[in-house]
């Protein structure tokens, strides 16, 4: 793992102290992160990695709507929190960073939980983000894998689903990752399987 997004509705579950500790642990492991911090300046900083001389920057934003992600503390000049997924904020961040790196990707924590499809507002915003100059979009939050589409010769992953997640529901979403060997998961319940879609007649 080289880069993670901290812009999500659980990064502040243990308050500012918890966020600070998360950042410290990631620093120790050498994992770059973006989307959250002790103030708005930190949250808007990209996580940058270089492969074969190519610089790749990541910016991360968390949705602000109560009906999708619930309460999320957003960072201000003097307050810790998340990077807010407002159009103006995203556009300005892309314009500020686009010319400094070879590629710029956007993490978005958005969407309706347990839905297999993006909302119209998601597709509209995604199109704008690519027009503003981002090279691709990687989404999460829905606990379901949502469509991958190509637009402007760039890719939009609306939601990657669950990589590794302790779900409390009986009909658990399938994980994105299927371990065949390696990690000992004997003490951590998880489920394989296909997505379950309830159909009412």
Predicted regions and their residues:
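Active-site environment of divalent metal-dependent phosphoester hydrolases
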Residues: 11-23, 40-45, 64-69, 111-116, ...
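Structural recognition of the beta-strand scaffold that forms the well-ordered cores
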Residues: 2-7, 13, 32-35, 56-60, ...
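Acidic/histidine-rich helix-loop elements
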Residues: 63-88, 112-115, 166-192
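Binuclear metal-dependent hydrolase catalytic cores centered on His/Asp/Glu-rich metal-binding motifs
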Residues: 50-104, 124
């Amino acid at each position: 793992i080289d880069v993670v997004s901290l812009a999500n509705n659980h990064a502040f579950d243990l308050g500012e102290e918890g966020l600070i500790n998360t950042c410290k642990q990631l620093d120790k492991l050498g994992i770059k992160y973006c989307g959250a911090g002790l103030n708005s300046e930190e949250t808007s900083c990209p996580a940058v990695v270089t492969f074969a001389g190519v610089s790749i920057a990541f910016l991360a934003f968390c949705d602000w709507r109560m009906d999708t992600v619930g309460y999320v503390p957003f960072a201000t000049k003097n307050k810790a929190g998340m990077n807010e997924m407002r159009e103006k904020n995203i556009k300005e961040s892309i314009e500020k960073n686009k010319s400094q790196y070879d590629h710029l990707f956007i993490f978005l924590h958005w969407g309706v939980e347990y839905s297999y499809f993006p909302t119209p507002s998601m597709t509209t915003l995604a199109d704008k983000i690519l027009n503003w100059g981002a090279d691709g979009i990687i989404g999460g939050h829905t606990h379901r894998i949502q469509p991958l589409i190509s637009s402007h010769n760039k890719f939009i992953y609306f939601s990657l689903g669950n990589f590794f997640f302790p779900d409390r529901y009986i009909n658990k979403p399938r994980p994105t990752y299927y371990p065949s060997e390696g990690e000992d998961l004997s003490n951590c319940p998880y489920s394989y399987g296909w997505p379950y879609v309830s159909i009412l007649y």
